[in-house]
Amino acid sequence: MARIGDGGDLLKCSFCGKSQKQVKKLIAGPGVYICDECIDLCNEIIEEELSEGAEVSLDELPKPKEIFEFLNSYVIGQEQAKKSLAVAVYNHYKRVQAGLQPMSGKHSKEEVVEVAKSNILVIGPTGCGKTYLAQTLARMLNVPFAIADATALTEAGYVGEDVENILLKLIQAADYDVKKAETGIIYIDEIDKVARKAENPSITRDVSGEGVQQALLKIIEGTTASVPPQGGRKHPHQEFIQIDTTNILFVVGGAFAGLEHIIEQRVGKKTLGFTAEVRGKAEREAEDLLAQVRPEDLTKFGLIPEFIGRLPLIASVSKLDQEALVQILTEPRNALVKQYQKLFELDGVELEFTPDAIEAIADNALERGTGARGLRAIIEEVLLHVMYDVPSRGDIAKVIVTREVVMDGVSPTLIPRESEKKKKSA
């Protein structure tokens, strides 16, 4: 038993030798003592070893069908996009796990098979699930995930964010574990906003358009980038973090408004016009056209050929109709209606949306043109006063939201606890 001094009663840690006065806690075992500092150190060592061995083996990598089914649990519709993403993600991480990077040391230079990275371009209107698809994939695979807005980026040397800041977000998402970040997923949104202003190269410098595309080329393709840990160029003497982007999967998304007209010119299809009667049909035809997109269409839109070449897989998502929005509100595992019902349940109150109320929320989102992204804002508006009042009242058992509440601003129906008790006992 570890003691200090002749016949002294002061105990000390059997590992670091610190006395019980020098540490916060000393835990006793059979003839041995360990202090809280040594326990923390042991935990750090174990966590480090576990994280090093936590990489998914090829056998554990979910198959495309499993990835598709997982996406189905969270994302409504967009079947073709989900299938394309499932295959692309499976092939990407299969390549990572098998170490099939260019010039692998396992074979001679003549035998090596170079498996190129398949980054993904997702095209479709806002609020249709482009970002959410990428987020859900990252959650399933338990890899770091970061979102960047292309409109905030400028090429190096100009006011704005450097493209390296995208990598910094991923490193931060991985708790500064660079090795973990090197197998993460980055979603770059609004990529259509950095399209070249004209199809022909401009004499003037396009620092937020073509310049950004040029700056993104290397990190998307795969390079060792130097990332400033504090971001930006404000700290010139900071040490840079080195990160290899070879195994980072880039998912790039954008609405690409007007791209359907470019595709239409190529395939020789005539537009229907924009009268009220044919608008719905015209929208459906526009979605069909987006599914036929080719690299040359994207070049005409304003993406440079080198950038398009780094995004070999193109998936399109379609505009959500009322039925799809109703499903989004009610069906997924973490559907919005279920989320708000859970919030009310925590206050001991039952929340009920009538079927026509849910349809009204979907109609409202369609009118605003916000897609699925605007659903939460509408529900927040509808429930604001109730969420303000109900927690302070202990007499409310149930809140019922009807179509009139959503469309006309009528107050939701509040059912007192006594009425609910009588109904159950009857």
From Swiss-Prot:
Keywords per UniProt: ATP-binding, Chaperone, Metal-binding, Nucleotide-binding, Zinc
GO cellular component: a single term: HslUV protease complex
A GO MF label: protein dimerization activity
Residues binding Zn(2+): 13, 16, 35, 38
Domain ClpX-type ZB: residue ranges: 1-54
Keyword Zinc: yes
Keyword presence, Cell membrane: no
Domain of life: Bacteria
Residue numbers binding ATP: 125-132
Family: Belongs to the ClpX chaperone family.
Subunit note: Component of the ClpX-ClpP complex. Forms a hexameric ring that, in the presence of ATP, binds to fourteen ClpP subunits assembled into a disk-like structure with a central cavity, resembling the structure of eukaryotic proteasomes.
HAMAP family per UniProt: ClpX
Job description of the protein: ATP-dependent specificity component of the Clp protease. It directs the protease to specific substrates. Can perform chaperone functions in the absence of ClpP.
PANTHER family noted in UniProt: ATP-DEPENDENT CLP PROTEASE ATP-BINDING SUBUNIT CLPX-LIKE, MITOCHONDRIAL, ATP-DEPENDENT CLP PROTEASE ATP-BINDING SUBUNIT CLPX-LIKE, MITOCHONDRIAL-RELATED
Protein name, as recorded: ATP-dependent Clp protease ATP-binding subunit ClpX
Name of the gene this protein is made from: clpX
